[in-house]
């Protein structure tokens, strides 16, 4: 239901109503009713799975068709048959404030047998708060987390309440990628001895992955995979070829899709396609030697909260396209790519209809899951509309 009250020449998105807008007025409908919407290539239906969530941040589909949903204020719920459970017990002590709280959740590849999952959160500690990664086991009765273990925490906690990152992507080898923002102190993103403003790569036990560009730690923290990131809140591995992509918030303009590679520097705050909120220039321009270019950027910003690559069966027309959940314009961006992976266009869906879109995930059946970052947030499902 609608909301309640790295290329040499990166692709750029600018608002074009004729191309991106949907000439469709969405009106309130009863809960669980489907809203039918025409897009450029296919008709879709949007259905509310459950409402009444408080600032949901992440969703994962369970093997039996239920869902796990995190709420930023510090709750994890199981959604089954259109009903959200009582909060799952066993979460560690969190820092909840500003942009911090319970953040992403990801199932271990062997979850069906092990019940293991990972989650990120902001936690309190010496000096303030910072981002941490945890592993746990969901109990068989789905009421509590067991064997909760903190695998990793960033090495410098501060009192700021923003730019914690942080989503998780799991590689075919079981290793974990996740991002941490600059924590609102932009120069930290250029310090390889500081975990802030970086993409990290860890083994399932929290130790640095074998491909660490800073192995040994003498030139940088060994968990760091790439640097120069402002606030990466989306991360995904393309299941077709294993390519890693991130999406991150710019300032006033300059949101980016990046393709991180080990040891590379993505420029923040030395280069950016945006400006400071004051209107002042950032760094030394939009490009400079030694810094990687994004594969795509937005000006003005859309405030991207998550990214996935569509590889499902339900929408073959969208195969290989990026799906980006956006907060600022309350939209789902479909970034069209050709067979070579080059970006060829963008379609903006659901703009202003459901609220701030925080997460997007392709479900096992090819449907698309969204959560809305609102006080009265929703878990939504996009499916292919039946033939009229």
Residue locations for each model-derived region?
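Bacterial N-terminal signal peptides
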Residues: 16-29
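Conserved blade-ending motifs and adjacent loop-strand segments that build the rim/top face
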Residues: 344-364
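Bacterial N-terminal signal peptides that target proteins for export
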Residues: 2-19
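Short, conserved, GDST-rich strand-edge loop motifs in beta-rich repeat architectures
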Residues: 178-196, 254-256, 260
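Beta-propeller fold detector
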Residues: 47-48, 85-92, 144-153, 210-214, ...
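Blade/loop signatures of beta-propeller domains
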Residues: 33-45, 143-145, 207-217, 273-289, ...
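Beta-propeller blade signature
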Residues: 132-141, 193-204, 260
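Acidic, Gly/Ser/Thr-rich repeat motifs that build Ca2+-stabilized beta-propeller blades
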Residues: 33-186, 234-250, 300-339, 363-384
């Amino acid at each position: 239901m609608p909301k309640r009250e790295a290329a040499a020449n990166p692709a750029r998105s600018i608002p074009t109503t004729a191309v991106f807008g949907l000439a469709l007025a969405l009106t309130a409908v009863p809960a669980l009713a489907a809203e039918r919407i025409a897009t450029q290539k296919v008709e879709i239906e949007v259905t509310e799975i459950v409402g009444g969530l408080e600032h949901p941040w992440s969703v994962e589909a369970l093997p039996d068709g239920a869902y796990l949903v995190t709420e930023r204020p510090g709750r994890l719920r199981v959604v089954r048959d259109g009903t959200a459970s009582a909060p799952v017990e066993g979460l560690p002590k969190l820092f909840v404030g500003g942009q911090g709280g319970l953040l992403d959740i990801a199932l271990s590849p062997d979850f069906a047998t092990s019940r293991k999952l990972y989650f990120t959160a902001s936690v309190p500690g010496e000096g303030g708060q910072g981002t941490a990664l945890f592993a746990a086991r969901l109990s068989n009765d789905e009421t509590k987390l067991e064997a909760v273990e903190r695998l990793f925490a960033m090495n410098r906690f501060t009192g700021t309440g923003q730019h914690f990152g942080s989503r998780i992507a799991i590689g075919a080898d079981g290793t974990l990628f996740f991002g941490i923002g600059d924590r609102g102190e932009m120069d930290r993103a250029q310090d390889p001895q500081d975990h802030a403003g970086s993409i990290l790569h860890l083994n399932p036990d929290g130790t640095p992955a074998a491909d660490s560009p800073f192995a040994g730690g003498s030139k940088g923290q060994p968990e760091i995979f790439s640097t120069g990131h402002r606030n990466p809140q989306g991360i995904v591995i393309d299941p077709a070829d294993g390519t890693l992509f991130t999406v991150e918030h710019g300032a006033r303009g300059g949101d980016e899709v990046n393709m991180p590679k080990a040891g590379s520097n993505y420029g923040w705050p030395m280069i950016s396609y945006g400006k400071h909120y004051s209107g002042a220039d950032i760094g030394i321009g939009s490009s400079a030697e030694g810094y990687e270019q994004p594969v795509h950027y937005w000006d003005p910003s859309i405030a991207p909260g998550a990214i996935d690559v569509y590889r499902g069966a339900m929408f073959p027309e969208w195969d290989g396209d990026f799906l980006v959940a956006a907060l600022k314009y309350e939209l789902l961006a479909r970034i069209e790519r050709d067979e070579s992976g080059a970006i060829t266009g963008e379609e903006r869906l659901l703009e202003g209809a459901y609220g701030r879109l925080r997460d997007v995930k392709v479900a096992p059946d090819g449907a698309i899951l969204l959560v809305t970052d609102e006080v009265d947030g929703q878990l939504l499902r996009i499916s292919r509309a039946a033939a009229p």
